[in-house]
Regions:
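N-terminal, polar/charged subdomain of small-to-medium soluble alpha/beta proteins
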Residues: 1-87
């Protein structure tokens, strides 16, 4: 079972990026019932707006999120959908 919570993802992102204007973390695991969703961990969606992302390409914004969550992902994130924008 995954040790990851929405609170853990949110606090990790806030600590790493600091200047977050909007953040929504949603557990979507229930949409992926069955072996793929249950066995490997949890499915998450992160919607984030951050000053540091202003002017960055979509790929660079996603990299910021992945870099911030590098210590959390192995704890049970199977899939991560990211909607990221600058402010």
């Amino acid at each position: 079972m995954s040790q990851v919570t929405a609170e853990l993802i949110e606090s990790t992102l806030r600590a790493a990026l600091g200047d977050i204007a909007a953040l929504d973390v949603v557990n979507e695991s229930h949409l992926h019932a069955g072996p793929a969703g249950a066995a490997e961990g949890s499915h998450w969606r992160v919607r984030i707006a951050c000053q540091r992302m202003t002017g960055l390409s979509p790929l660079a914004r996603h990299r910021l999120v992945y870099d911030a969550l590098q210590s959390v992902i192995p704890q049970g994130i199977h899939a991560l959908a990211i909607e990221a924008k600058g402010v």
